Amino acid sequence: MPIAQIHILEGRNDEQKETLIREVSEAISRSLDAPLTSVRVIITEMAKGHFGIGGELASKVRR
């Protein structure tokens, strides 16, 4: 059972996350020749104040 864990900054809507899950699942299924029903995708959303980019908080870099 392939499992993909993806960390993203908060702010995406459910439709965007659903698209991400579907497309990642399809890519994993295709590339590993695994049944689509066996693929798991975990999305972890991070607050922009809990992530750094180039030494600064993402909340300051990305608005």
UniProtKB/Swiss-Prot annotation:
Gene field: xylH
First-level EC class: isomerase
Family to which this protein belongs: Belongs to the 4-oxalocrotonate tautomerase family.
Pfam families: Tautomerase
Keyword hit for Nucleus: no
Protein name per its UniProtKB record: 2-hydroxymuconate tautomerase
Cleaved signal peptide residues: none
CDD domains on file: 4Oxalocrotonate_Tautomerase
